Amino acid sequence: MKRLLTIIALAVAVTALNAQTPKDVKYSFTEASELNLIGKIIKDTPNPYHRVDTVKYKGFTKGENSQVRSSAGLAVLFKTNSSVISVLTEYGYMNKGVNTMGVSLRGYDLYIKKDGEWLYAASKANSVGKEDQNLVLVKDMDDSMKECMLYLPIYSEEYSVKIGIEEGAVIEAIE
């Protein structure tokens, strides 16, 4: 009986893992900072995902310095006709706090506009140790043009955030 339950559990786990990332999708990536990045306190920073230029503005404690380099409150506005939206992130500092969920520390929130209203579409974060992998946020959507708002991680620093769409689809900045 234990063996049967183990086999069933493994089959379910493998099926769930296969459902996460579409296998036959070829991705095209666009750096998020090339689209419309909103929510910044100071527009011109050496790293587009920092809220404050810590080279220019000194006097922060270690904790404050880490916080102003995180992307809390930043979002990317874009439109796409892709049926899949993913994110490929290069982290500078990735918070791994034990008292906060991974989706807050290093995850993304995606909203899609429908009938003039932003609707929640997905929240996801890569597992610890798999931060460099392509994170599929949504899949199996229709190929109509969708306006999207992607909130960046709250408690981590990013060097690069690339939005992945399927090859042949378009992605453009929106206001």
Question: Which residues fall in each region the model found?
Answer:
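N-terminal secretory targeting modules
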Residues: 20-175
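Bacterial Sec-dependent N-terminal signal peptides
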Residues: 1-23
